[in-house]
Amino acid sequence: MRTLIREDLEAARDRLESLTAPQRLAWAFEHCGDGFALTTSFGIQSSVLLHMLSRLPTGHSVPVIWVDTGYLPPETYQYSEQLMELFDVRLVVAQSSISPARMEALHGRLWETGDVVDLETYHRIRKVEPLEQAMADHGVTCWASGVRSSQTDHRRSMSWLDPIRDRLSLRPLLDWTPRDIYYYMQEHDLPQHPLFEKGYSTVGDWHSSGPDAGELSGRETRFGGLKQECGIHLPQDAVEGLMGDGI
């Protein structure tokens, strides 16, 4: 990421505030060129940002990075095939250098211990490190994701554009509501994730996701209630000590 003085960053945020979500994507590509990428989880709302990207004249040249932990539900893998065919994306699959079986042999089933430190180790191995490696391999300086401010306490503190681990993180949908997502998908006839009809409002790994139930909804259903963020969207100082060498 090029060095930004605070005035540059604030000016960019002010500009992004006045744009629509698709225009924010176009702005990022215009300013970052080949250094721009998009991340996707092929989750409940993923079709929205992929659809917006596909409608940009240069959209098909933008790398779309998907962190495949090896623990996603079968429905997510099926949905990913559907969306890849629909949008013809330039997909980059980011995976850990250690297989799920090897990780479990060395570290156990980290998501079953009820210890947040073990969850952080799991997320570092299976999510954060693979994403950072993929971004480094593709020279990414700015990446867009579909996070929204209403999802978690941490995300309420986000702005349109923030530095994260030596790159810029763009949030085109930051001010969108679940209703905005739903109506956009209806307007453009976008397919729903199969688990949406089973009560899921968010989905990640099979062992750390569940349908909305009772007072629990959204990100509260993730990670056994121990945490709401996997580390991908956290700043450097929040993950120092968890990251591996060279990340």
Residue ranges and their predicted role:
Residues M1-I247:
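Nucleotide-activated chemistry modules centered on ATP-dependent adenylation/adenylyltransferase
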